[in-house]
């Protein structure tokens, strides 16, 4: 993970090199992936209302710092590989309404600072159309805001030639 200052410095450097910018909020003190969605230590002990507010404030703070540095990310990912949710345990898919409230706080914070940035919701196992369908059907049912579907696909971890095109075409 990177601090806000490190993120801004890298984004400025990448933009100066002509690269398109994507920011990925893991909302964790360490790498977040399907098996690890531990919220930051500083957020432990917060009630759900406080957790929503701190997620919004953190996202807005980073996005505003990027804007102030002249960087407009083309894409912003709210959560990293979140098939079972993010910011555990409150943001688990065991409680879709709460997860969607957190996702929407991230979305709103991004759009407030950078209206043109496209917000991504990112799920792994792109070859598993049933999983994608279940996840995005629930996200839609509960009102999740997003602009783009993000998909991870790791063929070297899978047997045979798994097909990811069903998830893309669906």
Task: Give names to the regions the model predicted.
Residues 1, 79, 152:
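Conserved residues at the C-terminal ends of beta-strands
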Residues 1-16, 20:
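N-terminal carbohydrate-binding/catalytic regions of secreted carbohydrate-active enzymes
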Residues 4-5, 33-146, 158-169:
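Active-site cleft segment of glycoside hydrolase catalytic domains centered on the general acid/base Glu
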Residues 28-29, 81, 154:
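Positions that flank functional sites
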Residues 150-156:
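Short, flexible active-site loops
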């Amino acid at each position: 993970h990177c601090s806000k200052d490190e993120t801004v410095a890298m984004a400025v450097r990448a933009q100066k090199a002509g690269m398109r910018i994507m920011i990925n909020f893991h909302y964790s003190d360490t790498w977040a992936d399907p098996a690890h969605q531990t919220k930051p230590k500083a957020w432990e002990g917060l009630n759900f209302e406080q957790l929503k507010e701190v997620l919004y404030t953190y996202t807005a703070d980073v996005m505003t710092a990027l804007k102030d540095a002249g960087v407009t990310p083309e894409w912003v990912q709210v959560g990293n590989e979140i098939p079972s949710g993010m910011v555990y345990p409150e943001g688990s898919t065991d409680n879709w309404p709460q997860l969607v409230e957190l996702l929407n706080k991230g979305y709103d914070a991004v759009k407030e600072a950078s209206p043109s940035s496209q917000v991504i919701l990112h799920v792994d196992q792109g070859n598993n159309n049933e999983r994608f369908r279940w996840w995005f059907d629930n996200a839609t049912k509960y009102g999740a805001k997003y602009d783009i579907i993000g998909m991870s696909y790791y063929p070297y971890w899978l047997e045979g030639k798994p097909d990811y095109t069903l998830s893309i075409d669906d």
